[in-house]
Amino acid sequence: KGEHVAIMGDNGAGKSTFVRQITAVEKRTGGKVWFNGRYVEFDGPLAAREAGIETVFQTLALADHLDVPDNLFLGREKIRFNLGPFSILDYKGMREATLAGLRKTGVKIPNISNTIQHMSGGQRQCVAIARTATFHSKLTIMDEPTAALGVQETAQVENIIRTLKEQGEPLILISHNMRQVMDLCDRIVVWRRGRICANLRKEETDGQDVVAYITGAKTQEQYAGAA
C-alpha cells in the first residue's frame, strides 16, 4: 500500500495488455489476480472499478460535450430521489464531490462548468486523474499519462502523482520516460515479450541497468524463462 510501481518495456512487451487484463477490459487466458489481499475475478471493467481500481488510459474516456462533474460521475451519478421511473440527480452533491477530488489531487481547473472540449490536453488528463480521488480508489493505474502532453502539462500531471504519493495512494504507472519513472516510482517491473524479466527497487538500479533488461541484454535469474 502506498507504493508507486512503474511498468516498463519496449513496444509490444505486454504492458498495456497486462493492465487491460487486471481491469477485465480483456479476458485473461491464465493466471490469477490478487487485489487488496484476496483473489478476485472481475467479470468486466465496471466490477474492477467498483472494487476500487481506477484507470487512466492513453485514450481518455471523457465526454467532450460534458463539464467536469458530469464526466467524473458519468455512469455513477448521485441520485437525490426517484420519482416513479425517473431519477432526480444530485447536481449539488456531484459538484461538491468534484471540487473535493480536485483539491485532494491538487488539480487546478479554472472553471469546472466548462465542457471538456474547451480544455487543454493537460487539463483533460488532470480531470481523468481527479476521478481517482473523487471515488477514493484503492489503486490507480496510469497508462502513459503524459505521452501526448507538453512540458508544462507534463509537470502538472507529475505534481499530481507526487500528491497521490504523499497521501499514500498506491499507483501503477506505465511509462517509457526513464526520468519520470526514476523520479516518481519506488519500484520498476520490466516486461519483455509478454513476461516479467526484472523486478527492481529504484535505489538499487539506474537507467542504464533498466535499459539492459528492456533490450534483453539482462534478465533476472528468477525470471529466466523470459529470456
PLM region spans:
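Glycine-rich phosphate-binding loops of nucleotide-dependent enzymes
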Residues: 1-227
